Amino acid sequence: MKKYLKHAGADVSASIVVLLVALPLCLGIALGSGAPLFSGIIAGVVGGIVIGALSGSQLSVSGPAAGLTVIVATAITKLQVYEAFLLAVVIGGLLQVILGFLKAGVIGDYVPNAVIKGMLAAIGLILILKQFPHLIGYDTDFEGDESFIQSNDQNTFTAMFEAIKYITPTALVIGVLSILLMIFWESKFIKTKKSLKLFPGALMVVLVGTIVNEYLRLSGSSYALEQKHLVTLPVAESAGAFFSFFTFPDIQFLKNPDVWMSGITLAIVASLETLLAIEAADKLDPLKRVTPTNRELKAQGIGNMVSGMIGGLPLTSVVVRTSANISAGAKSKMSTILHGSMMLLCVMFVPMILNKIPLCSLAAVLIFTGYKLAKVSLFKEFYVKGWNQFIPFVATIIAILFTDLLIGILVGICVALFFLIRSNFRSAVMVVNDDHNYLIRFRKDVSFLNKPIVKKKLEEVPKNSFVIIDAERADFIDKDVIEEVNNFLCHAHLKKIRVEVKTGQNKSTKNIFSIPQITEE
């Protein structure tokens, strides 16, 4: 407990920032999923408190994810009854716990670094592009939408141009003022003032935006922002009304195969998104701590079971909230737990105050977070590393921008695999010749993709040559390649080619070639 109290100041400050970022995202994702608004809040609270406590990650923040929006909306429509969907969420959570015990968390280790960094940069760009309309008061799409094709039938870019046609002057002024304040709060001047450092920039932005709009409203100005441009939390008039927001799964739907299919789909997609987000969180962590991924799957599974049992949306670890948490200076998991606790207290006791916060102020916070994720220096870093790193990095960004997170990641992995295979293809077989003396050396892993080049080089060996086939440095040689070499060995004497074979003591390559015994006639 002492290690958490040691950084209490930083964690409390960061938790406020995460709360301000998470609230509209929870509501927006619930709206975009076609679920009750309060289901997003439930998921946010459970993600903060339950998963925050059980997770081995010190900085990851869980909550309802934009990447599950389409899956959730489809499942709710297909199942028709929300209680049946909640049962699917519980089943999905149970399957995640099982995946954790089966040690499926290792999957995340196979995603290349260029793809993970590309995902982070893409999310940063998405935040900037998607929040721009909210910054200037065009709030037609729900908060947290990350897909290229939006729920209002526009795409990321057309929405920006459309937003310019319908600028809300007050939102524009507050939004620009908020960004300038965020930049100022990052300056050396603020960092040298201990008293000001205690207040996170995001909190100051929200306070200034709220005060400006409240002043306009109380003075009767027509420039005051309407409620559609503000946070909109469900408000309960009594304790009974508050508890009526909770919904419970109906076990009679266990017989419905669609419930099970929805649960399996949620488990697979939520687990993949979580593992990717955890990889990203570990790379963003200044202390480079490593999260136990199997424990994370178990924590996510328990969180999803709890969320589904009380009416909440499915959960994953979320990069946007995590990056906001790290950017705000969080040091431990107390920040995550505190943000969930404060969210619960806020919706219980002060929802009417939170409903005065302008969305344009929160958009400024998210845009600034996006900028930190997609800095120009990151692009330069991968460009310097070479094309085999830069192209998968850029491909991941472009694919995520024009599709969604999971499809973009898969595209990035495929591009990275192409460069890996290409590199291995080039280095696996080396051919050197001096007059009629040939050296054919196999290195690393020689796959079936190397068969054409091996076949071609062996066929090109002229009569009366001397050939050394060296497999001492090979870890693996595909059977198709072995067959080609054996075929060459079998017929080499017909062209009066002398062959020496070296296989070394490696068990995987020793005695793999059939050296014929040729007798002189």
Ranges and model annotations:
Residues 54, 67-89:
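Membrane-embedded helix boundary and interhelical linker motif in transport proteins
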Residues 26-28, 48-56, 71, 75, ...:
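Alpha-helical transmembrane segments of multipass membrane proteins
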Residues 372-521:
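The feature marks cytosolic C-terminal regulatory regions of anion transporters and related permeases
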Residues 1-15, 80-288, 352-353, 360-400, ...:
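Core transmembrane helix bundle of multi-pass membrane transport proteins
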Residues 16, 46, 65, 90-94, ...:
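Hydrophobic residues within alpha-helical transmembrane segments
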Residues 53-63, 188-194, 327-333, 377-384:
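Membrane-helix interface "capping/anchor" motifs
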Residues 4-13, 21, 25-58, 253-334:
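Membrane-embedded helical hairpins/re-entrant loop segments and their flanking transmembrane helices
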Residues 63, 86-111, 120, 290-361, ...:
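Helix-loop-helix junctions within the multi-pass membrane cores of secondary transporters/permeases
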